[in-house]
């Protein structure tokens, strides 16, 4: 990274719009509880495959990213909370695609034997120093060579977000991503029935290959189209749901309220010989249950 790029990165991180809100919450030791009481939920997949995202150049939705004359969603760590304007391709006065490949795009592959067991409880309403939110999750899938990949979470919840709110680590019945400023705008704005952020581990064939990692999962309305294209906001399907599992190539900077790039050790080799630097896995054959109360 050049000195000019480093300076731009620092400026964009300092401009993060959620900083004031997060500062007010991150030292709270006795946060308020969810209105109406806790929500407990279970999300399972016991058969079928999964869709695994591959690095791709995301098409940029003008509703989320604006135009070259009036850009939107550019502050914060690139890829986490914004996309710098210099990282965007322009044609005929409009943003077209991201210049860099990320976990968010249309390219994907399928893998077999997708299994997911997730039990979560949303108790704490807001970001805070302490949380009663909980998630226990194990997800796994298998490549064509018979290797099994897995992600486990959560040894601890991310009770307060470095750059955007995490609502104690678990949030239910909210809108995330896209225009919201909560999570990367490279995903469409999507109604989210349940989501979590926590610290977990990445495994291959039963052996831990990367730990600790920030793990994000969410049950959302459907944001894929024909040929599994990642759609724009106007193309979201509100009457279908799927579960996204994300281990992003970023980690929080210790002692600071920002992220830095750090590839995930997945153990999965891409056709070009490089290791896939993230996991972005979609589960679609779901059994879902929920109730008020712990």
Across the structure, where does each feature detected by a protein language model lie?
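Low-complexity, polar-biased intrinsically disordered regions enriched in Pro/Ser/Thr/Gly
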Residues: 61-103, 163-187, 224-236, 257-268
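Polybasic, proline/glycine-rich intrinsically disordered low-complexity segments
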Residues: 57-58, 101, 108-110, 119-129, ...
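Predominantly extracellular/secreted and cell-surface proteins with exposed
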Residues: 88-213
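Sec-dependent, cleavable N-terminal signal peptides
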Residues: 1-4
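Tryptophan-anchored aromatic micro-motifs
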Residues: 10-107, 196, 200
């Amino acid at each position: 990274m050049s000195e000019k790029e480093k300076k731009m990165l620092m400026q964009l991180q300092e401009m993060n719009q959620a900083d004031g809100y997060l500062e007010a919450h991150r030292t709270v030791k006795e946060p308020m509880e969810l209105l109406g009481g806790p929500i407990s939920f279970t999300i399972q997949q016991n058969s079928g495959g999964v869709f695994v995202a591959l690095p791709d150049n995301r098409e940029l939705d003008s509703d989320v990213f604006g135009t070259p004359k009036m850009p939107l969603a550019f502050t914060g760590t690139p890829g986490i909370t914004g996309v710098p304007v210099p990282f965007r391709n322009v044609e005929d006065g409009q943003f077209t695609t991201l210049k860099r490949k990320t976990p968010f795009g249309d390219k994907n592959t399928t893998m077999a034997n997708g299994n997911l067991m997730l039990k979560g409880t949303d108790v704490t309403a807001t970001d805070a120093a302490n949380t009663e939110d909980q998630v226990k999750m194990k997800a796994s899938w298998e490549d064509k060579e018979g290797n099994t990949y897995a992600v486990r979470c959560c040894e601890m919840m991310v009770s307060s977000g470095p750059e955007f709110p995490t609502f104690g680590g678990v949030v239910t019945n909210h809108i995330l991503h896209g225009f919201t400023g909560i999570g990367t705008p490279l995903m469409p704005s999507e109604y989210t029935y349940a989501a979590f952020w926590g610290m977990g581990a990445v495994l291959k064939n039963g052996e831990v290959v990367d730990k600790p990692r920030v793990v994000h999962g969410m049950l959302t309305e459907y944001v894929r189209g024909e040929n599994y294209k990642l759609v724009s906001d106007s193309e979201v399907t509100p009457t279908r749901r799927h579960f996204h599992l994300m281990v992003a190539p970023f980690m929080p900077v210790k002692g600071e309220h920002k992220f830095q790039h750090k590839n995930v050790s997945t153990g999965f080799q891409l056709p070009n010989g490089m290791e896939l630097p993230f996991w972005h896995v979609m589960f679609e054959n779901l059994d879902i249950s929920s109730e008020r109360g712990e």
